[in-house]
């Protein structure tokens, strides 16, 4: 039990003091700088009085770090880690410890942001490029993305891609009945609001007569069946449909690739490549497509371009496809994906190489074949003659006794109708196979059965094409070399372990080591998501408490932890609204009002939920134009479903009229969706569920300390008021009744019941350590830090939006647009020049084109804030030199930025400023300078000359001839 302490002691001596950057003395100095007598007075000038919560958060006392770690060890011990042979897309793995220590547990990798500034992201971009190369080679297709959320959502994205790409009148999609049930559930959820029909059947007998725009085939099947899909694909193509194969990535080292089989799209999960099951995630989903479909591919794509020196450099390619550009017309609402997990999977492939992966696959297949031979000897019939790692066994009325004996052996099996399924993996040993035989009633010896084993791969489906011939998959076989390769890549990146990342709307706060440590505990890492619930008591205690805490913090009545990104949380929340109206006989309510300043995921999610987006204007202060909102709500009153509003606004201000906005929408029968992206400005001060919102998603990877991982993982749980609770996401593989007592009967939005469950431990520990008072203080300091930055920068770069009392919320927008006219300097020039000062740029051109949005969070010290502000002010002085004619903009340090060590080492320097000004501006420290590895990257060249995977080694050989 924790030692009882007062709230003042907790803040002064506890973890909160470590999490919050400024010291009490610095806070006092910063308050003087912004002209506020106290934090409470500043909050009174920042937040509308009408939304302030009256009671403190009831979260219990904060724990010390040792107490929290001991508590997490107790929870992990309550989870029973059985040998799970359930399969169904989740398998035991062995992550190489060199990868675990140097990537998964390394803040240089997990604290980075999405690589929108590619010059300072070359390390993880190269790792993602390797991931894409691996996926393209194994699937036999031309272009892959840099990860999706999981296999289920990847399947739904593939279905949507097929519908967009095939202009057929039919709105039906065929799904192989041997598809994983969670994948089918996600497909049905995605299809229903869009009016698409899901046809489930046997592709051998049913696909040829179906009129569909596409079909999904599981390869191998969920039951383990291994069938040649070529005749089915040919029949589908003959009728104008696209073929999607959901593939087992490890099996593809032995089996013919989807591309060779004629598939147009391949999807799946890279979990088998060394990533623990984690009770459902996070894992990197993947998608690969034929070249003709590349511009419809959802998610982020890493491409190769050149920098200002003509050297190869990586960047995000084809970004105009993405939701922040195309909004409701985007290919997808996908934003955060699973970058850290894709990096882990790519390094697993680098570690083992193609020969090692094939050897693992052959070993698994051999053990599965031996297992099947033993079961046949015991008198059981296996359903499939051809298989890779999974067999389905007819057991009839013996099922219960076999399950009981298997539990005695600490083994979980997949339970079917008179059948049992068994899926083996790289952790399966001969002793486990013998234990399975004992569960089936026989004491057999592996050594005696093995000689009778026969290859059970389909004879016409064996892989003949080479894969992963590129050098990167062959160079780093010793741990020494791999360790240095990973270090080399991480040194190329700028993450939170090196400097503040002031990205607006991203909340790049501290991801504390203590919060991260439980992630690696076996009790959390190695549970199968469909293991019996009695084996996951620790997880369920954590889920119940976390849901209760999040409901307390937000003022909602019920919470779902299933959505595994903020965008998926938006989608799930809108589906809950849709389900509510359907239950009331009002399915026609489909109008969604969205302010023009909204993040692009809002309209993209609304479109996915089958809603029609109507844009609401903003006024000159950046607030929602209440008169325009009222007029549009009245116009669409009979069909109004919701308003989606971000609060504080994306303009960095608490709008005074938020209660009026909620009242207007409610008066016309609509619901209020309050985007939780900016919840870090409200925790402990205001609760959305109390001032009028009906539903919000909660970005745990922002407000509640899950690291961004370079672009994922994230988690986007949703909180709802009681009337929407019955429509929270459900799942076909579990009971979804939460601690709130509501049964969650909505559609499935993620492959696993609790999304990326293992990273929920991070937010849980964060709240444990902070307590209610610590969380409130963090919010107050986040707002103070933003106002401090705004006050320092306003004389140099005008702050675009403030409230009536001159305050910003937790972020501010500075406006350099006038400087483009006076000097020719662009916002991109400023962003790249900040790299020379050792900083990641703020958010560029969102929500206002040509501006910078800055969010310092509560975790940055006054010294780091001053260093950033000094850099911005120094850049303004450099711009003044251009304005006065000292430099032409084309020959200025801003246009040549970022400067690299190659610039410093040039024999001849022909620029009108010195090397010192270029490389060490305004006296920046020389002893620990971050050196950008490449010059400014040519985005246009990269999109015109799209290269998204490494060429095979044969191409190098041909080029050398």
From Swiss-Prot:
Cellular component annotations (GO), alphabetically ordered: cytosol; glycine cleavage complex
**Main EC class of this protein?**
oxidoreductase
Kindly list the cysteine pairs connected by disulfide bridges: none
* Superkingdom field: Bacteria
One Gene Ontology term of the molecular function aspect: pyridoxal phosphate binding
Tell me the cofactors it needs.
Answer: pyridoxal 5'-phosphate
What EC identifiers does the entry list? 1.4.4.2
- Summary of the function given for this chain in its UniProt record: The glycine cleavage system catalyzes the degradation of glycine. The P protein binds the alpha-amino group of glycine through its pyridoxal phosphate cofactor; CO(2) is released and the remaining methylamine moiety is then transferred to the lipoamide cofactor of the H protein.
Give the family, as the similarity comment puts it. Belongs to the GcvP family.
- What name does UniProt use for this protein? Glycine dehydrogenase (decarboxylating)
What gene makes this protein?
Answer: gcvP
């Amino acid at each position: 039990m924790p030692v009882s302490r007062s709230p003042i002691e907790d803040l002064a001596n506890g973890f909160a003091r470590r999490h919050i950057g400024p010291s009490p003395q610095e806070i006092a100095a910063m308050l003087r700088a912004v002209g506020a007598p106290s934090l409470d007075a500043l909050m009174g000038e920042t937040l509308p009085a009408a939304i302030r919560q009256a009671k403190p958060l009831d979260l219990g006392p904060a724990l010390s770090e040792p107490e929290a770690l001991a508590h997490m060890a107790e929870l992990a011990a309550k989870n029973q880690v059985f040998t799970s042979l359930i399969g169904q897309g989740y398998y035991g793995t062995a992550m190489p410890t060199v990868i675990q220590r140097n990537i998964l547990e390394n803040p240089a990798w997990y604290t980075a942001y999405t690589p929108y500034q590619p010059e300072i992201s070359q390390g993880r971009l190269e790792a993602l490029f390797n991931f894409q190369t691996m996926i393209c080679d194994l699937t036999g297709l031309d272009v892959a993305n840099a990860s999706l959320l999981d296999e289920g959502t990847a399947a739904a994205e593939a279905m949507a891609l097929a519908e967009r790409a095939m202009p057929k009148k039919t709105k039906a999609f065929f799904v192989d009945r041997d598809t994983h049930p969670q994948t089918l559930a996600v497909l049905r959820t995605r299809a229903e609001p869009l009016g698409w029909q899901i046809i489930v059947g046997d592709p051998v007998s049913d696909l040829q007569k179906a009129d569909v725009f596409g079909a999904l085939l599981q390869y191998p099947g969920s039951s383990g069946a291994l069938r040649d899909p070529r005749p089915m694909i040919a029949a589908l193509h003959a009728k104008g449909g696209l073929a999607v194969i959901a593939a087992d990535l490890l099996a593809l080292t032995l089996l013919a690739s989807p591309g060779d089989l004629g598939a147009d799209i391949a999807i799946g999960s890279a979990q088998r490549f060394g990533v623990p099951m984690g009770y459902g995630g996070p894992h990197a989903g993947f998608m690969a497509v034929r070249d003709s479909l590349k511009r419809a591919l959802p998610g982020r794509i890493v491409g190769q371009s050149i920098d200002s020196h003509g050297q190869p450099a990586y960047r995000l390619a084809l970004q105009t496809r993405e939701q922040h550009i195309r909004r409701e017309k985007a290919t997808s609402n996908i934003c955060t994906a699973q970058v850290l997990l894709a990096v882990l999977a790519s390094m697993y492939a680098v570690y083992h190489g193609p020969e090692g992966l094939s050897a693992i696959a052959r070993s698994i297949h051999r053990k599965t074949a031996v297992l099947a031979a033993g079961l046949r000897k015991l008198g059981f019939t296996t359903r499939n003659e051809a298989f890779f790692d999974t067999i389905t066994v007819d057991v009839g009325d013996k099922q219960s006794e076999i399950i009981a004996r298997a539990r005695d052996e600490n083994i979980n099996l997949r339970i079917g109708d008179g059948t049992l399924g068994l899926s083996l993996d790289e952790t399966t040993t001969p002793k486990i196979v013998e234990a399975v035989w004992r569960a089936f009633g026989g004491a057999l010896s592996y050594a005696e059965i093995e000689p009778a084993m026969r290859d059970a791969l389909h004879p016409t489906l064996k892989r003949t094409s080479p894969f992963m011939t590129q050098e990167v998959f062959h160079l780093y076989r010793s741990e020494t070399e791999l360790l240095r390769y990973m270090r080399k890549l991480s040194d190329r990146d700028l993450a939170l372990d090196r400097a503040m990342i002031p990205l607006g709307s991203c909340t790049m706060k501290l991801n504390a080591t203590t919060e991260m440590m439980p992630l690696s505990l076996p009790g959390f890492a190695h549970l199968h998501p469909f293991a019996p619930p009695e084996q996951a008591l620790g997880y369920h205690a954590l889920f119940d408490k976390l849901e209760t805490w999040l409901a307390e913090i937000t003022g909602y009545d019920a919470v779902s932890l299933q959505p595994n990104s903020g965008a998926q949380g938006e989608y799930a929340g809108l589906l809950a609204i849709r389900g509510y109206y359907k239950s009331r006989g009002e399915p026609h309510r489909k109008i969604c009002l969205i302010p023009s300043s909204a993040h692009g995921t809002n309209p993209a999610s609304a479109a996915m939920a089958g809603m029609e987006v109507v844009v609401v204007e903003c006024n000159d202060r950046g607030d929602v134009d209440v008169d325009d909102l009222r007029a549009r709500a009245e116009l669409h009153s009979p069909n109004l479903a919701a308003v989606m509003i971000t609060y504080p606004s994306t303009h960095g201000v608490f709008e005074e009229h938020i209660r009026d906005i909620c009242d207007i929408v409610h008066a016309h029968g609509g619901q209020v969706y309050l985007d939780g992206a900016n919840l870090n400005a409200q925790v402990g001060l205001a609760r959305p569920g109390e001032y009028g919102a009906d539903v919000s998603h909660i970005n745990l990877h922002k407000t509640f300390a899950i690291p961004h991982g370079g672009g994922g993982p994230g988690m986007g749980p949703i909180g709802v008021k009681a009337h929407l609770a019955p429509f929270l996401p459900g799942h076909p593989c579990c009971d979804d009744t939460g601690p709130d007592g509501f049964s969650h009967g909505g559609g499935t939005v993620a492959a696993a019941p609790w999304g990326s469950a293992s990273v929920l431990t991070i937010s849980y520990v964060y709240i444990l350590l902070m307590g209610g008072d610590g969380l409130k203080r963090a919010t107050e300091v986040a707002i103070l830090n933003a106002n401090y930055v705004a006050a320092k920068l306003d004389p140099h770069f005008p702050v675009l939006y403030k409230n009536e009392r001159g305050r910003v919320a937790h972020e501010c927008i500075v406006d350099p647009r006038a400087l483009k006219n006076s000097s020719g300097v662009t916002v991109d020039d400023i962003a790249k020049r900040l790299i020379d000062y050792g900083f990641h740029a703020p958010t560029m051109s969102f929500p206002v084109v040509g501006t910078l949005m800055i969010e310092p969070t509560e975790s940055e010290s006054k010294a780091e804030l001053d260093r950033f502000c000094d850099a911005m002010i120094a850049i303004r002085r450099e711009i003044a030199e251009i304005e006065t004619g000292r430099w032409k903009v084309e020959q200025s340090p801003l246009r040549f930025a970022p400067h690299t060590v190659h610039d410093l080492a040039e024999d001849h320097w022909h620029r009108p400023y010195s090397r010192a000004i270029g490389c060490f501006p305004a006296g920046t420290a020389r002893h620990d300078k971050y050196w950008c590895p490449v010059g400014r990257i040519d985005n246009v060249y990269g999109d015109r000359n799209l290269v998204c995977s490494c060429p095979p080694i044969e191409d190098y050989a041909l080029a050398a001839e």
